[in-house]
Amino acid sequence: MKKIILAGGCFWGVEEFLSRINGVVSTEVGYANGRTENPTYEDICTKNTYFAEVCLVNYDENIISLKELLAKFWTIIDPTSLNKQGNDVGSQYRTGIYYVDPSDLEEILNSKEELQKSYSKKIVTEVKPLENYYKAEEYHQKYLKKNPNGYCHIKLD
């Protein structure tokens, strides 16, 4: 079982999209790489905590490779947009790939470099080791499964 943490704007849609991928074993939304401890959703939105809304993904590398997973992730974000995805604006909506296994870094950078060839603008998706992670409140978990008509900036159909 492998783990990767992906930020692509509002985590509700990112989690729903990723949870539908064959080989993804589990997903959880949370807050990553910020400046405080135990942030709440309100903290993320109103204070300068610098956390990103993220989806923690556990996947079976025998079914889907990191390269394949990232290829799918790139399709749901605008990697050239800084601190904004869809109608959501703020540093918490930045795009990022946060790794826990240093051996994943080369594959992540290769994926980003390959994608850059398709864009004239610079890709601003950050690639960093996971520094800290806090699970989001329960009402955010599987939000679009519980609220099928809830807000989502990603086309899921």
Curated annotation (Swiss-Prot):
It holds the Pfam family PMSR. InterPro entries: Met_Sox_Rdtase_MsrA_dom, Met_Sox_Rdtase_MsrA_sf, MsrA_MetSO_reductase. The keyword GTP-binding does not apply. SUPFAM superfamilies: Peptide methionine sulfoxide reductase. Its EC number is 1.8.4.11. GO terms for molecular function: L-methionine-(S)-S-oxide reductase activity; peptide-methionine (S)-S-oxide reductase activity. The keyword Coiled coil does not apply. It catalyses: L-methionyl-[protein] + [thioredoxin]-disulfide + H2O = L-methionyl-(S)-S-oxide-[protein] + [thioredoxin]-dithiol; [thioredoxin]-disulfide + L-methionine + H2O = L-methionine (S)-S-oxide + [thioredoxin]-dithiol. GO terms for cellular component: cytoplasm. The active site is at C10. Gene3D superfamilies: Peptide methionine sulphoxide reductase MsrA. Keywords: Oxidoreductase. GO terms for biological process: cellular response to oxidative stress; protein modification process. Has an important function as a repair enzyme for proteins that have been inactivated by oxidation. Catalyzes the reversible oxidation-reduction of methionine sulfoxide in proteins to methionine. Belongs to the MsrA Met sulfoxide reductase family. HAMAP family: MsrA (MF_01401). This is Peptide methionine sulfoxide reductase MsrA.
